[in-house]
Design a protein with these regions (language model features):
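Residue-identity detector for glutamine
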Residues: 1, 22, 61-64, 101, ...
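Radical SAM enzyme [4Fe-4S]-AdoMet core and its adjacent flexible, acidic
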Residues: 2, 6-18, 25, 29-142, ...
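A cytosolic small-molecule/anion-sensing beta-strand core signal
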Residues: 155
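Flexible mid-to-C-terminal extensions adjoining Fe-S/redox cofactors in radical SAM and related proteins
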Residues: 166-279
Length: 279
């Protein structure tokens, strides 16, 4: 509750945790399946296990953890967030997670999940990482080679390339003048999706874990490489820490799947000491 109410307040400035839990309990009462997308910020990032165990306690089997990274930049039209095009402008928002926090959060959470919860609780980034390890589609655009399939429509009918790119330069049109098919299958949108791969800096292209993250979301690529090349993901250090940490576990689960065995076998292997992890 403390994590939630620190930022999640209603329009009167009051905490909203109780209302959210009432909604969840109503869904459970009527047998409605649900999942959670939890934002990881500067506060809750330091408590990964408390955060994860809470979701397990309330019966949430499907969890997506989304790191929040935003830059503040005021515009004349009233906007206060910096777009990717403004990659050298803006100030990192106080609520943003650091790369180190993100890496530590994922590793700590994974260590509990891989020992106790494989096949019981489904954490999207772990599932997506295993999919990429297998050479399959990851099921989430941020970790895919290309993107462009997650357009968003605003209340007035304006359509943008992505819900992370609701900026004037990424507006595709309006539903009153163009169809969704026209906009989402346009050359402009196709180019937007391909730029996810084409705009990667050399450091990413030469990285041993490119296959696993594919540069993550372009929205976060406002940092520079050690050589000064633009386009490096702000969270790169955290993701690299995570992939390096989980590599031997992913190798084991991949082998299980390749041999038509459940990846959940890793829990028994770890328990029996059959799987030796060396970093």
């Amino acid at each position: 509750q403390e994590f939630h109410d620190d930022y999640r307040k209603n329009k009167l400035g009051k905490p909203s945790f109780v209302k959210v839990m009432q909604g969840i309990n109503l869904l459970k009462k009527h047998g409605v399946e649900w999942n959670a997308m939890a934002v990881i910020n500067d506060f809750n990032a330091d408590y990964p296990l408390d955060f994860y165990r809470f979701f397990k306690e309330i019966g949430c089997q499907y969890i997506q953890f989304a790191p929040i990274v935003e830059r503040i930049l005021s515009h004349e039209d009233g906007r206060h967030l910096a777009s990717l095009a403004e990659n050298k402008a803006g100030t990192l928002a106080d609520f943003s997670i650091t790369p180190e926090q993100w890496g530590n959060f994922l590793c700590a959470l994974f260590d509990e999940w891989v020992k106790e919860d494989v096949g019981k609780y489904y954490v999207q980034i772990f599932d997506s990482t295993l999919a990429n390890w297998m050479g399959e589609q990851p099921g989430i655009c941020t970790m895919a080679k290309t993107c462009g399939h997650a357009g968003v429509m605003e209340f007035n009918g304006d359509v943008y390339s992505c819900d992370h790119f609701v900026f004037p330069e990424y507006k595709l049109g309006n539903i009153y003048s163009k169809t969704l098919v026209e906009m989402m299958h346009s050359e402009r949108q196709h180019n937007f999706g391909n730029m996810k791969y084409q705009s990667l800096p050399t450091q990413c292209k030469e990285c041993e874990f490119l296959f696993a993250c594919n540069g993550e979301c372009p929205k976060n690529r406002f940092s520079q490489t050690a050589e000064g090349e633009p386009g490096l993901n702000y969270l790169c250090k955290g993701y690299y820490q995570f992939f390096k940490h989980v590599a031997p576990y992913m190798d084991f689960m991949k082998n299980e799947l390749m041999n038509q065995r459940p990846p959940a076998n890793i829990m028994e292997a770890l328990k029996n000491g059959d799987l030796k992890i060396e970093y």
